[in-house]
Amino acid sequence: MSDEEHQFESKADAGASKTYPQQAGTIRKNGYIVIKGRPCKVVEVSTSKTGKHGHAKCHFVAIDIFTGKKLEDIVPSSHNCDVPHVNRTDYQLIDISEDGFVSLLTDNGNTKDDLRLPTDENLLSLIKDGFAEGKDLVVSVMSAMGEEQINALKDIGPK
C-alpha cells in the first residue's frame, strides 16, 4: 500500500465501448454503421457477387446522424464493421441561454446544461418560437460515440 492519493475520474459510460462489431452482410437499410469514424444511418445497401478472387462485397450509402453528410463504404460481406451504440432520450426544455446552450430536465430531476441548440434551421426556429410562446417543449436527444445532439421536438401543450 502506498501513501499516494489515487485520483479516479468517473466516466458516464464506465468504459463501455462506443461501437460493437457486426458482420457487413447482416447490416440492413435503416441500420447504423461507422464510416470514416462517423456514426451513420444506412440509407442504401447493395451487394456484389463474389468475384474470381474474392468475397462478395457490400456497398453502403449512409448519412452521418449528426452532420447529415452522405458517406459511402465498400466492405467484404464476411468482414466485421463497427456499429455505433445509438441512444435517444427525451428531455423537457427548461431554458435557452444567450450563448446557444439549452438547459434540459432529466428524468431524475437533474438539469443537463452541456448541449447546444441544433444547427438545423427549421428545428432551431421551432424550438425558439415554441419556447418564446411559453409552450412546454420536449426535445429528443440522440447520442452516439460520445456525441450528443438535439434532433427532434415534441410540443406537450401550453404551460
Curated annotation (Swiss-Prot):
Xref: Gene3D superfamilies: 2.30.30.30, Nucleic acid-binding proteins
Keyword Phosphoprotein among record annotations: no
Pfam families with a match to the protein in the record: eIF-5a, IF5A-like_N
Highest taxon in the source lineage: Eukaryota
Compositional bias per record (Basic and acidic residues), positions renumbered to this chain: 1-12
SMART domains, sorted: eIF-5a (SM01376)
Hypusine carried by residues: K52
GO biological-process terms attached to the record: positive regulation of translational elongation; positive regulation of translational termination; translational elongation
UniProtKB keywords: Hypusine, Initiation factor, Protein biosynthesis
Region span, Disordered: 1-21
Molecular function, one GO term: ribosome binding
Protein modification: Lys-52 undergoes hypusination, a unique post-translational modification that consists in the addition of a butylamino group from spermidine to lysine side chain, leading to the formation of the unusual amino acid hypusine. eIF-5As are the only known proteins to undergo this modification, which is essential for their function.
NCBIfam families linked to this entry: eIF_5A (TIGR00037)
Role noted for this protein: Translation factor that promotes translation elongation and termination, particularly upon ribosome stalling at specific amino acid sequence contexts. Binds between the exit (E) and peptidyl (P) site of the ribosome and promotes rescue of stalled ribosome: specifically required for efficient translation of polyproline-containing peptides as well as other motifs that stall the ribosome. Acts as a ribosome quality control (RQC) cofactor by joining the RQC complex to facilitate peptidyl transfer during CAT tailing step.
Family from the record: Belongs to the eIF-5A family.
PANTHER family: TRANSLATION INITIATION FACTOR 5A FAMILY MEMBER
Protein name from the UniProt record: Eukaryotic translation initiation factor 5A-3
Organism: Solanum lycopersicum (Tomato)
